[in-house]
């Protein structure tokens, strides 16, 4: 067994974006049977090939499994993930109150409806409000319990006319930004954005999604619904299907009676199961409380490999490094060394989420080296 300690943990980003390997923001594993490091001439030829108009970037299945991607850490377990989401509902339904509630809980890291919440900076563009109304609303909802991680603005530029730069600057100045709420989407659409074609809607969402993915954060876009009913309730979202088609998911808030306090929140997305939550609005604080969930949150089945690593390898060690063969010798599992490396590339996100352990695989002169270390910045 090889066991070493380092004074400082290696700098590895564990974030949200699953589309990019850990090569710029993370680390890219090399195939277990990979060759020598590429020469300058090989890299030059590869760059020339990539610049050709006919070049199509592909990745083999072997390369896919030999690459470690960053996992999407949820902002709110089972409910809100990094990506671009539409939050739709009829006007004057209480959407902005629920947005303030989400923003407050993420900025403080306090559980929302008993769902675990991860703390981060939040920017709320309340573009249909003013600061006086915001102050009164927040005081009614939370009293004077405040937070330094929640920022508001009641004016912003439009897409293609300054908003992109404003958001990029805010994120650059607040590195731990996890959530940006734009209330409402219509307020930031480009001038002449009344063109509700599929192509136009898809392009708008793709542009916003590109920003959210690049920064590994959640972009929540408040939007309205149509008056007409639809067999699929998400078809009630105003605009064309291009909005939902390009988004990572959507939330749909509906009241049973417009004058009542009961509502349903339906959730559909790529990174969470479809679900329906039954909410009730507190008449004093105007906070939304959870009455019940129609379905229990789906949980991934236990993964013995991760439990073995947490218990046998990392229980008394803040840091461990060694070869895949050395790791296999430590755990009570029948698994081949090259298989364990690939499996850990896939499960690295779960290892961090469930046990607070970071993982890196890299090739050195002696062969492949695996490294594990505990993250002390937050609890697992």
Regions found by a protein language model. Name each.
Residues 1-53:
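Short, small/acidic-rich helices and loops at N termini and domain boundaries
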Residues 70-71, 93, 116-203, 210, ...:
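Conserved inter-motif catalytic segment of the P-loop NTP-binding fold
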Residues 46-145:
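The Walker A/P-loop phosphate-binding site
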Residues 130, 134, 159, 163, ...:
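Helical mechanochemical/support elements of P-loop NTPase systems and associated helical scaffolds
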Residues 80, 103, 124, 183, ...:
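Conserved RecA-like P-loop NTPase ATPase core
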Residues 71, 86-88, 92, 96-97, ...:
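Phosphate-binding/switch region of NTP-binding enzymes
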Residues 278-380:
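DNA transaction DNA-binding modules
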């Amino acid at each position: 067994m090889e066991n070493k300690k380092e004074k400082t943990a290696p700098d590895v980003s564990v974030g949200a974006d699953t589309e990019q390997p850990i090569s710029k923001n993370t680390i890219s594993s090399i195939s277990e049977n990979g060759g020598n490091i590429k020469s300058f001439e090989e890299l030059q030829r590869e760059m020339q090939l990539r610049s050709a108009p006919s070049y199509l970037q592909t990745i083999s299945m072997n390369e896919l499994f030999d690459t470690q991607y960053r996992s999407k850490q949820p902002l709110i377990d089972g409910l809100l993930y990094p990506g671009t989401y539409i939050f739709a509902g009829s006007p004057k339904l209480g959407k902005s109150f629920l947005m303030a509630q989400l923003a407050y809980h993420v900025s403080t890291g306090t559980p929302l409806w008993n769902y675990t919440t991860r703390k981060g900076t939040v920017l709320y563009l309340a573009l249909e409000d003013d600061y006086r109304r915001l102050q009164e609303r927040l005081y009614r909802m939370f009293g004077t319990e405040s937070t330094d991680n929640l920022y508001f603005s009641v004016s912003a530029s439009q897409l293609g006319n300054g908003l992109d730069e404003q958001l990029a600057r805010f994120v650059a100045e607040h590195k731990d930004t996890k959530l940006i709420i734009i209330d409402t989407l219509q307020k930031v659409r480009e001038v002449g954005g009344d063109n509700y074609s599929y192509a136009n809607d898809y392009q708008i969402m793709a542009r916003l999604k590109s920003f959210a993915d690049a920064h590994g954060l959640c972009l929540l876009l408040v939007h309205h619904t149509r008056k007409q009913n639809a067999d699929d309730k998400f078809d009630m979202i105003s605009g064309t299907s291009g909005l939902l088609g390009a988004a990572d998911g959507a939330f749909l808030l509906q009241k049973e009676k417009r004058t009542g306090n009961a509502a349903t929140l339906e959730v559909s997305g790529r990174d969470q199961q479809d679900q329906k939550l039954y909410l009730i609005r507190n008449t004093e604080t105007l906070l939304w409380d959870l009455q019940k969930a129609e379905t229990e949150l789906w949980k991934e089945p236990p993964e013995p490999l991760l439990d073995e690593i947490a218990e046998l390898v990392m229980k008394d060690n803040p840091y461990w490094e060694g070869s895949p063969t050395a790791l296999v010798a430590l755990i009570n599992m029948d698994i081949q060394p090259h298989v364990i490396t690939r499996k850990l590339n896939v499960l690295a996100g779960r290892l961090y989420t469930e046990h607070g352990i970071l993982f890196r695989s890299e090739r050195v002169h002696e062969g492949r080296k695996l490294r594990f270390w505990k993250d002390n910045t937050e609890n697992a």
